[in-house]
Regions:
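Structured-RNA-binding interfaces characteristic of tRNA pseudouridine synthases
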Residues: 1-259
Length: 259
C-alpha cells in the first residue's frame, strides 16, 4: 500500500499528435502512460502515482501541462527532471519539477487555463504543419470571426459547447479572454504565409468546449451561421451545437495557472 509522504508538481510540454491524450487508457499510447513508464525506469519501482491537472483529447498538444507525483520517498527535483528528459520520447519534455506540500491539489489549484487554436485557410499547407494547425480550403471572414470570438467572453451557459452534455451538469463557465489574431506563436519555413490563432482563457472548461467554440467560429467565418446564432447559443437552449468539434491537432494547452 502506497503511503504518500512526498508530493511533486511536474510541468510538462508535449506534441500530442501521436498520442491518445493525457490520461492512461488500456492498449493505447498516452502521455501519462509514457510518463509513468519512464518514472518506473528512473526510480526503479512503481510505488508512486501520478495525477494530471486536466485531461487532453487525442492529438492535442501542450506548452504547459501539469501533473502531480505522489511518492513515499524524497526525490531530488533537479535529478528527476534531468533523468526523465534523458529517457522520455523526444516529443515529451519535463520543463520543471517542484516539491509541494500535502495540501496542494493539482486539479483544484489549477484555476486558469489558456488554450490556443491554430488554423489557416486557402491553399493546402505543407504536411509538416499537420500536427500544429487546422486547415480550411474555403476563404474565411477573419474580421467577422474576430467579432464572434468576443461574444464568448464573460459568464455564459455553455451547454451547447459540451460534448455529450448531461442535463444535471452545471454549464455555467466564465471566459476571461477570447480573441483571434495573426499567429506569431509558432512559425517555421513550412508554415503558411499567414495563419491565425484563437486564444481562449478561462477558469474551467467543459469536455471539448474549446474545440466546439473553434468549430463554431469556423462555421461563422464560412458564412454558415451568424453572429446572432452564437449569441443565442449561449443561453443554453437547444439540443444540438451550432458548430462542430474542430480537429484536435490545432489545439494547444498553452498555460496552466495555479493559486
Amino acid at each position: 500500500m502506497l503511503e504518500n509522504k512526498f508530493y511533486y508538481l511536474v510541468h510538462l510540454q508535449f506534441l500530442g499528435f501521436r498520442y491518445h491524450g493525457w490520461q492512461k487508457q488500456p492498449q493505447v499510447k498516452t502521455i501519462q502512460h509514457m510518463l509513468d513508464r519512464t518514472l518506473i525506469t528512473v526510480l526503479g519501482h512503481d510505488n508512486f502515482k501520478t495525477l494530471g491537472a486536466s485531461r487532453t483529447d487525442a492529438m492535442v498538444s501542450a506548452n504547459h501541462h501539469c501533473c502531480e507525483i505522489f511518492a513515499n520517498e524524497k526525490i531530488d527535483p533537479e535529478y528527476l527532471q534531468k533523468s526523465l528528459n534523458l529517457n522520455l520520447p523526444q516529443d515529451i519534455k519535463v520543463s520543471s519539477i517542484e516539491e509541494v506540500d500535502k495540501d496542494f491539489k493539482v486539479i483544484n489549484n489549477a484555476k486558469v487555463k489558456e488554450y490556443l487554436y491554430f488554423f489557416c485557410y486557402g491553399e493546402k499547407f505543407h504536411p509538416f504543419c499537420a500536427p500544429f494547425m487546422c486547415h480550411v480550403h474555403e476563404e474565411l471572414d477573419i474580421p467577422l470571426m474576430q467579432k464572434g470570438a468576443k461574444i464568448f467572453e464573460g459568464q455564459h451557459n455553455f451547454k451547447l459547447y459540451s460534448h455529450r452534455a448531461n442535463e444535471n451538469k452545471n454549464f455555467e463557465r466564465t471566459i476571461s479572454q477570447s480573441q483571434i489574431e495573426i499567429n506569431d506563436y509558432f512559425t517555421g519555413s513550412f508554415f503558411p504565409k499567414e495563419s491565425y490563432v484563437l486564444k481562449i482563457k478561462g477558469e474551467g472548461f467543459l469536455r471539448q468546449q474549446v474545440r466546439l467554440m473553434a468549430g463554431t467560429l469556423l462555421k461563422l467565418g464560412l458564412g454558415e451561421i451568424t453572429i446572432e446564432d452564437i449569441t443565442k447559443s449561449l443561453d443554453g437552449e437547444g439540443d444540438y451545437p451550432i458548430g462542430f468539434i474542430a480537429p484536435a491537432s490545432g489545439l494547444v494547452l498553452n498555460k496552466t495557472e495555479f493559486l
